[in-house]
């Protein structure tokens, strides 16, 4: 029997937590930055409107403001983020005792042995978890559902925000093969650039490479 793995990724986590205290800013570009008062430091997180303006995580504040002059900068509150992360993880723990955190805002849940307790429908359970986190904590997440951890993570990245994507035995080739090779876990910018020099730009092209 295939395993049933969820990868849960909280959307724009730092920014989303800050916006719980600033609901009036939800529709404007917002970023959490290292030192917004002095305009030094880097962008730690951004919301969807800021993302649409081209603001990127890890770029400098001045670069972000150049792209998006009306960007609202908020200071980081790391203790608060840990508190919300713990609350979300406590919800996950109610569905499986096989939860594995991946950073402060991502987790894998192996629900293989507990799925039958919640109706047996993996997508329905993923949706229920999303809706519960949103209802109880005011945060959205994307969930990838698959038969292994790598594909589950690709699924959570496939559609954002607040969405569930199922990558199954039946559809995985049509979803996974066309994705950029950089979407793979642990394939960073340097590796992606090197692979590109050999004409490998998609996961499917990488899979077709000879092992030699």
Feature-to-residue mapping (PLM):
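Gly/Gly-Pro- and Ser/Thr-rich, intrinsically disordered tail segments characteristic of DNA damage-repair
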Residues: 1-212
């Amino acid at each position: 029997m295939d395993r049933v793995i969820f990868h849960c990724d909280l959307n724009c986590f730092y920014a989303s937590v800050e916006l719980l205290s600033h609901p009036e800013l939800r529709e404007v570009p917002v970023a959490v930055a290292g030192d917004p008062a002095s305009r030094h430091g880097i962008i730690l997180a951004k919301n969807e409107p800021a993302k649409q303006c081209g603001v990127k995580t890890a770029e400098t504040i001045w670069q972000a403001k150049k792209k998006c002059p009306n960007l609202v900068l908020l200071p980081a509150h790391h203790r608060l983020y840990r508190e919300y992360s713990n609350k979300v993880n406590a919800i996950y723990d109610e569905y499986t005792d096989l939860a594995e955190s991946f950073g402060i805002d991502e987790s894998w849940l192996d629900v293989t042995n507990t799925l039958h307790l919640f109706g047996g429908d993996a997508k329905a359970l993923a949706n229920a978890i999303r809706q519960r986190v949103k209802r109880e904590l005011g945060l959205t997440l994307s969930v990838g559902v698959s038969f292994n951890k790598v594909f589950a993570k690709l699924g959570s990245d496939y559609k954002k925000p607040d969405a569930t994507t199922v990558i199954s035995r039946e559809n995985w080739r049509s979803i996974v093969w066309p994705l950029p090779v950089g979407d793979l876990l642990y394939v960073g910018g340097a590796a992606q650039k090197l692979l590109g020099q050999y004409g490998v730009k998609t996961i499917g092209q990488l899979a077709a490479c000879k092992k030699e």
